[in-house]
Amino acid sequence: MDTKIGSIDACNPTNHDIGGPPNGGVSTVQNTSPLHSTTVSPCDATLGRYLARRLVEIGVTDVFSVPGDFNLTLLDHLIAEPNLKLIGCCNELNAGYAADGYARSRGVGACVVTFTVGGLSVLNAIAGAYSENLPLICIVGGPNSNDYGTNRILHHTIGLPDFTQELRCFQAVTCFQAVINNLEEAHELIDTAISTALKESKPVYISISCNLPAIPLPTFSRHPVPFMLPMKVSNQIGLDAAVEAAAEFLNKAVKPVLVGGPKMRVAKAADAFVELADASGYGLAVMPSAKGQVPEHHKHFIGTYWGAVSTAFCAEIVESADAYLFAGPIFNDYSSVGYSLLLKKEKAIIVQPDRVTIGNGPAFGCVLMKDFLSELAKRIKHNNTSYENYHRIYVPEGKPLRDNPNESLRVNVLFQHIQNMLSSESAVLAETGDSWFNCQKLKLPEGCGYEFQMQYGSIGWSVGATLGYAQAMPNRRVIACIGDGSFQVTAQDVSTMIRCGQKTIIFLINNGGYTIEVEIHDGPYNVIKNWNYTAFVEAIHNGEGKCWTAKVRCEEELVKAINTATNEEKESFCFIEVIVHKDDTSKELLEWGSRVSAANSRPPNPQ
């Protein structure tokens, strides 16, 4: 028997260009289970219980799983951990999405599936978590340790005696891989995998042979040493030089602005970014995938910068600035609206988690974003010109005209009512599609959460992610905005939400197809079979648990449904199907779709 350890090279910083792979996360470990003694009982001194204790130690109290014959014994031992709850999902893809949503709230998530048929099913969700810099522990129940190297063919494989197909697939979307088929090194591999996920803020893969979880071993008889992750520190000389150069660059600008990007999460730099905004007085914007990371009630907040589809008057201020500092940006074809942003490199300071680049000039490595922003705040001159310009040109958006009592509901009216539902005790999850653009216009109250998956953009993500986020934050009311096409991809785990007693509100926007794809490139393949969605959810409910549904076609019905969901059914899972016209799309989606389509349609370069 041998133990294979995958490379962690994928985590090493290799590309610091704009839009390059994110890296550099530093995580704090929370020990949620006080240790009352240094030893554990012999029946608990097993590999399975050791893994369970380690998950609890880092703050994971819920694991999302799908049972299979290779992971059943492992699941028994995870269930036996009193501080760990096993959440059975309807399929592996949703289990992975749930772990993704959980990690967005708790800081780390975990899922357990079976060998190959489960592993390859969850792979898409793991890839999404990798792209979004989320630490996620993907655990797979693997073949019996005696079968390695025997040239045997096993079920749940592609019919070859080589068992590494699954491992090779995961190597591309995880930062560390451990195949545990002997007990001697199991604790070391588990600890290395978990600590690597936390350090790199990326998913890891752990495969455990199905005959090992129940075996006692003296190694597991003592409580493990708590995780102590080394804190990354900036190179002081580089930090000082970067701050001096950036301060000189910004202090001579007339109307500089700040723009927050999604990598602020992995850099844990949101507070430092706000500190810089307070000190500078600059207009403060966020990229779309950073919405929710910066308080929108900040006095200098000017909205979402998304090129041609920015919130009102934000693009005018950002693109007319003579200097802009981007903290943790990702410039891909989606966030750049088909590479159409009107930005100039010579005007930009790009701050990545561990690197600062100033205009066309110097780049400073080994400089942590959090340290850089905090030190820069001490050196920057106050200049509120960009915010004053925004305030001068800003015209408040008019409220949508009230619908006639029996008129078909308009999408902008729907989101006006969703806006009124938001509070510090709520969170919004936006599915890929027109909800991206409508939710960007929501003004988040202080403390209101917000999540969506922009880099990977996998339709259907929000169903599983809503399950995981709500499980991690039971005291928040999660509001999910999901299109009908996306819902059909992953709808089954509404069942799990009801079974777990979650009080989520899902707005199912029924417009008869894949609207976002229609605006990129239309065709008959974007038309879907209409479901009776409320009847579908009622069938899943089947009289067990708290569930309430409504189908609304006009504003009057919507108001009544929201009132019910937020009052007498506030402790229930609520599903509101909103029927709108298929052509009722946001102008932002129309603009964005045409530009992304143009980028996709570029002819080949001449050879």
Curated annotation (Swiss-Prot):
Belongs to the TPP enzyme family. One of its GO terms (biological process) is response to hypoxia. GO terms for molecular function: magnesium ion binding; pyruvate decarboxylase activity; thiamine pyrophosphate binding. Its cofactor is a metal cation; thiamine diphosphate. Substrate binds at D69, H156, E517. InterPro entries: DHS-like_NAD/FAD-binding_dom, PDC/IPDC-like, THDP-binding, Thiamin_PyroP_enz_cen_dom, Thiamin_PyroP_enz_TPP-bd_dom, TPP_enzyme_TPP-bd, TPP_PDC_IPDC, TPP_PYR_PDC_IPDC-like. Its EC number is 4.1.1.1. It catalyses: a 2-oxocarboxylate + H(+) = an aldehyde + CO2. Mg(2+) binds at D484, N511, G513. Residues 1-22 are annotated as: Disordered. Homotetramer. One of its GO terms (cellular component) is cytosol. Disulfide bonds: none annotated. It is an enzyme of class 4 (lyase). Binds 1 metal ion per subunit. Binds 1 thiamine pyrophosphate per subunit. This is Pyruvate decarboxylase 2. It comes from the Eukaryota. Expressed at low levels in roots, shoots, flowers, siliques and seeds. Induction: By abscisic acid (ABA), salt, osmotic stress, wounding and paraquat. Not induced by anoxia. Residues 434-516 are annotated as: Thiamine pyrophosphate binding. Keywords: Decarboxylase, Lyase, Magnesium, Metal-binding, Pyruvate, Stress response, Thiamine pyrophosphate.
